[in-house]
Amino acid sequence: MEKPVIILSCDVNERDRMRMRQEYFEAVIEAGGVPVVMPPLMLRSQIDEWLDRIDADALMLTGGCDIDPQTFRETPVRGLGRVSLQRDVYELGLLEACMLRGMPVLGICRGLQVINVALGGSLYQDILSQMGTEFARHQQKEPTEVATHEVAFIAGSMAENLFQTQFLPTNSHHHQCVHRVADDLTVSGTTVDGVVEALEWPEREIFAVQFHPERMRDGNPTMCGFFKNWIERVAAVASTKKSEIAKND
């Protein structure tokens, strides 16, 4: 079976430079995929042209800065961190284009939030001031590979299937989180304080987590297995699409 091509969204910093933590593309390569980083194109026509040329199989929305609250029709609150409207526009356009092509999507941390906002949901801009929870630790100071809280997955969900467990110790690096869940998405993972840690739309092969599995792969077969399982699902979807195209030719 051909290795699936995975689009990775990138970050844009204050100096207008593209950047990405290497764990994202390393995780894809180790799991049997081919990563391709997409530049921050702003026009939908440019995104469509790029996708037509690349012929990718799936999209991974990576982590990064806060999401500008104007994207979900709210005004900023005290505690909001750095935002990048440029990145918001780029990723929202990219997600829409990939979904129209029926591509599987994986969101990580900020990526989960982008998916929820794109589909009509909203966010708590700052967990501490708006949600009032300090029980679970969501902005850890420990090394990123260290688990600081546990996520409970719904039995029979994509989350449980991909991670092959119902209870998963994870890291945590966020202060925004899901508030109103988009209608098409299902919450499949939470922490004990009620913070949403996994969202999914199985019929569209859309899955997202609030934590960073890519940073916990070293010596952790569960996190490595997650990426392998996801890449296998992507490859299966791509194979089915190609078979259908061949039948119609």
What is each of the regions a protein language model found here?
Residues 212:
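Surface-exposed interaction regions that form or flank ligand-binding interfaces
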Residues 1-106, 116-117, 124, 128-160, ...:
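N-terminal beta1-alpha1 cap of cysteine-dependent amidohydrolase-like domains
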Residues 112-114:
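Hydrophobic, aromatic-enriched interface-forming segments
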Residues 176:
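Alpha/beta catalytic cores of group-transfer enzymes, especially the acyltransferase/condensing modules
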Residues 109:
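Conserved G/P- and acidic residue-centered "switch" motifs that form tight phosphate/ATP-binding loops
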